[in-house]
Amino acid sequence: YDNVNLDEILANDRLLVPYIKCLLDEGKKAPDAKELKEHIRXAL
């Protein structure tokens, strides 16, 4: 998750929505989103 720029994702709805859907198991998982989901507790 070191390669994931959370500030960029949070500032851009086009990026944020797919990440949220991935975290909620509601959408396709992009590689970065999947990696973030695996490490979400450490990332936050």
From Swiss-Prot:
Cellular component annotations (GO), alphabetically ordered: extracellular region
Pfam families, A to Z: OS-D (PF03392)
Location in the cell: Secreted
InterPro entries (UniProt xref): A10/PebIII, OS_D_A10/PebIII_sf
GO biological process per UniProt: defense response to bacterium
Gene3D superfamilies (UniProt xref): Insect odorant-binding protein A10/Ejaculatory bulb-specific protein 3
Keywords: Antibiotic, Antimicrobial, Secreted
Keyword Thylakoid: no
Highest taxon of the lineage: Eukaryota
Primary residence: secreted
Assigned protein family: Belongs to the insect A10/OS-D protein family.
Role, per record: Has antibacterial activity against the Gram-negative bacteria E.coli and E.cloacae, but not against the Gram-negative bacteria P.aeruginosa, P.vulgaris, K.pneumoniae and S.enteritidis or the Gram-positive bacteria S.aureus, S.epidermidis and S.salivarius.
The name this protein goes by in its record: Viresin
Source organism of this protein record: Heliothis virescens
